[in-house]
Amino acid sequence: AEVKLGADDGALVFSPSSFSVAKGEGISFKNNAGFPHNIVFDEDEVPAGVDVSKISQEDYLDGAGESFTVTLTEKGTYKFYCEPHAGAGMKGEVTVT
């Protein structure tokens, strides 16, 4: 699955913001617009036992085209956000099946 950080029209969103992947399928988060973004999984909004520090990308992806890939191995729903833009609504959710 590929997720854009920033919509094609410049909106501060994950695109798509809600999606599903199979357990073990990689998710590539790619900076689309060149604004600094990161991907932080909410420790209260992931399946029990998941260590969010191991799946989050807290360092900023500053440039267009920079990417971060993560593979989730526990089934369930994970919520994530971009720290600098969470207040603008840059949040997302992935369901692992």
Swiss-Prot record:
It is found in: Plastid, Chloroplast thylakoid membrane. GO terms for cellular component: chloroplast thylakoid lumen; chloroplast thylakoid membrane. Its cofactor is Cu(2+). It comes from the Eukaryota. Cu cation binds at residues 37, 82, 85, 90. Keywords: Chloroplast, Copper, Electron transport, Membrane, Metal-binding, Plastid, Thylakoid, Transport. It is a peripheral membrane protein. Gene3D superfamilies: Cupredoxins - blue copper proteins (2.60.40.420). Coiled coil: none annotated. Disulfide bonds: none annotated. PANTHER family: PLASTOCYANIN MAJOR ISOFORM, CHLOROPLASTIC-RELATED. This is Plastocyanin. The gene is PETE.
